[in-house]
A protein has these predicted regions:
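Ligand-binding clefts of soluble mixed alpha/beta catalytic domains
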Residues: 1-518
């Protein structure tokens, strides 16, 4: 028995040594080897159960003394930020991470275990894809199960976090595209359906790797990447931080709450952050920093749809997702917010909306980019969210932005206003300019332009809108649940979250009738 165990250990060591032989090449590129990445990802001292380590042995090379097992993958179960996860890493130290014989079978088995055991799924991707010299049509067809499984995991509520350390090409690009969260490494990520050689052969187009599928492009333009890292080490740190927010939903409920911490930034500053006149821009991250535990905010997709701010934090120790605005919502911002809302619903994370929104972007370019379609998707996500939603109207709440940011009509569990809140279908100046333009055009058609009447109309419309939009009018009409001191925002949200949480946990005994007086 011991001799057989020694043989198993020797084969496992052979795979490690084969990958380690590429160390100098990886270090020259500023990269970590796959097993070093795995070591940094896992909690220190926690157990790691490696799976299917002998996959492909004697199938990639009939000589048992030369065959390297593993199938081109490293896989196993371990803890990341206190959450037990399934981890799958491309062993890119061997044959550039190309799948080896039985690698597909190993991959499918790893996914099967994750699905059956509801394990959060982390992928460390850097693979040249399938080895075309060993192409088999049956493996191509069966390989579709990989992508179907990723879709089923996400639908089931299993979070999928992917780091693209290098290439993620052709069908393998859908490993990235079907992930819930994607972290990309600047200068190393390559995610595209066709690389430069195939692109030129197929269409004649000439493009670089970076133009086609680089991290900067995907995090700023396509939106495929959510977080941008400068190197492997930072990417792994981001994955750990992300798992701390999205992973506990599938762990034991007692592990969800963290130790509450006061914000590092002083909440007393809140009175001077939001301009009363509504004309001075406000960076809503400054508000977030004075609400959340430790002023710690993990922003998602900060380079894509940048006016819309989405990210994870904790309030009084409980995880929350926060959405706010640093400008109008454009198509990219709406798509990002939709993805974020759905991700929070998947992980059971309550949503907090900090409204400071002048509306959705308008104009020919934005119409061509599908602002109506993407805005509608955001509204769909808000209306059908399955988690508690709490809205704070901090500043402007204009037009469809009120709807997309979970205004009163969308039934948030609680909605509070700051004294600086302003609610209207549009700003008074905008409404006045619009109506004067329409009226003036009608006068031109009749050949009689009355400038004094237009000026009087302009002033009257501004006055009408201004009188209706302030917090004293809206709160008087019960369009919120109260006006709060901005400095108490954190405490108000914490209490509202607790009310929602306890209400959901409370066991009720419904009857067909109410209790009647004797």
């Amino acid at each position: 028995m011991e001799s057989l165990l020694d043989r198993v250990s020797a084969l496992q060591a052979r795979a490690r040594d084969a990958s380690n032989a590429a160390r100098a090449r990886f270090e020259k590129r500023g990269q970590l080897l796959p097993r070093d990445r795995l070591g940094l990802l896992l909690d220190r001292g926690a157990p790691f159960l490696e799976l299917c380590s002998l996959a492909g042995y004697r199938l990639n090379n009939l000589d048992p003394e030369k065959s390297v097992p593993g199938g081109g993958l490293i896989a196993g179960i371990g803890e990341v930020s206190g959450v037990r996860c399934m981890i799958l890493a491309s062993d890119s130290g061997i044959a550039a991470g190309a799948l080896q014989p039985m690698g597909l079978n190993k991959h499918l088995r790893i996914q099967e275990i994750a699905l059956r055991c509801n394990l959060p799924y982390i992928q460390l991707v850097e693979s040249a894809g399938a080895n075309l010299m060993n192409y088999r049509v049956e493996e191509f067809v069966t390989g579709g199960q990989l992508f179907a499984n990723l879709a089923r995991m996400s639908a089931r509520g299993i979070p999928i976090v992917t780091i693209t350390h290098g290439s993620s090409t052709a069908g393998g690009a859908y490993q990235t595209g079907l992930s819930d969260f994607v972290i990309m490494v600047r200068g190393r990520t390559r995610a595209y359906l066709a690389g430069p050689p195939l692109l030129k052969a197929a269409t004649g187009e000439v493009a670089t790797d970076e133009e086609l599928g680089g991290a900067d492009m995907h995090t700023a333009i396509s939106g495929l990447g959510d977080l941008l890292a400068k190197d492997d080490r930072e990417a792994i740190g981001l994955a750990r931080a992300l798992m701390a927010h999205v992973g506990p939903a599938v762990a034991l409920p007692s592990s969800v709450r963290k130790t509450p911490q006061p914000p590092h930034c002083d909440p007393e500053d809140m009175l001077g952050i939001m301009a009363i006149d509504g004309r001075t821009p406000t960076d809503m991250r400054e508000v977030i920093a004075r609400i959340v535990d430790g002023s710690d905010f993990l922003e998602i997709g900060d380079r894509y749809g940048a006016f819309t701010v989405c990210g994870y934090a904790s309030i009084d120790g409980w995880p929350v997702g926060i959405i706010t605005n640093n400008g109008p919502i454009d198509a990219d911002g709406a798509a990002k917010a939709t993805h974020f809302i759905q991700s929070c619903c998947q992980s059971g994370t309550p949503l907090v909306y900090l409204q400071n929104i002048t509306g959705y972007m308008v104009g020919r370019l934005h119409e061509e980019r599908g602002i109506i379609k993407h805005g509608a998707k955001m509204i769909q996500a808000v209306a059908n969210a399955s988690v508690p939603q709490i809205t704070i109207q901090c500043g402007a709440s204009f037009g469809a932005g009120n709807y997309g940011m979970c205004g009163r009509g969308f039934g948030p569990h609680f909605l509070f206003s700051w004294p600086s809140a302003r609610t209207a279908v549009m700003g008074g100046q905008q409404a006045a300019d619009t109506m004067v333009h329409v009226t003036e055009a009608a006068m031109v058609r009749k050949g009689n332009i009355d400038k004094q009447k237009l000026e009087e109309m302009h002033g009257a419309i501004i006055d009408m809108f201004d009188r209706q939009m302030d917090v004293f009018t809206t709160s008087a009409h019960v369009l919120d649940d109260g006006v709060i001191d901005p400095r108490q925002t954190r405490d108000v949200i914490a209490l509202a979250l607790d009310v929602c949480r306890v209400g959901k946990q409370r066991a009720m005994q419904p009857m067909q009738f109410g209790v009647a007086r004797p």
